[in-house]
Amino acid sequence: MTTNDNMRALRFYQKRGFVLVAVHRDAVAAARALKPEIPLIGDDGIPIRDEIELEVLT
């Protein structure tokens, strides 16, 4: 699982055979309720909103 702004993580996992299996829209809002220090804006100025679920192909 990573957030929508984290292009480095998406590159890393996909190069190692992971595929996208789900996008949990607006999931970070719920996470911020528990951890308010999660920033609103992430890498490259991209708003942090969604969680992206990845799974490795076997």
Task: Give residue spans per PLM region.
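Conserved beta-strand-loop-alpha-helix junction that forms the acyl-donor binding cleft
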Residues: 1-9, 19, 25-33
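Short, well-ordered beta-strand micro-motif
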Residues: 53-57
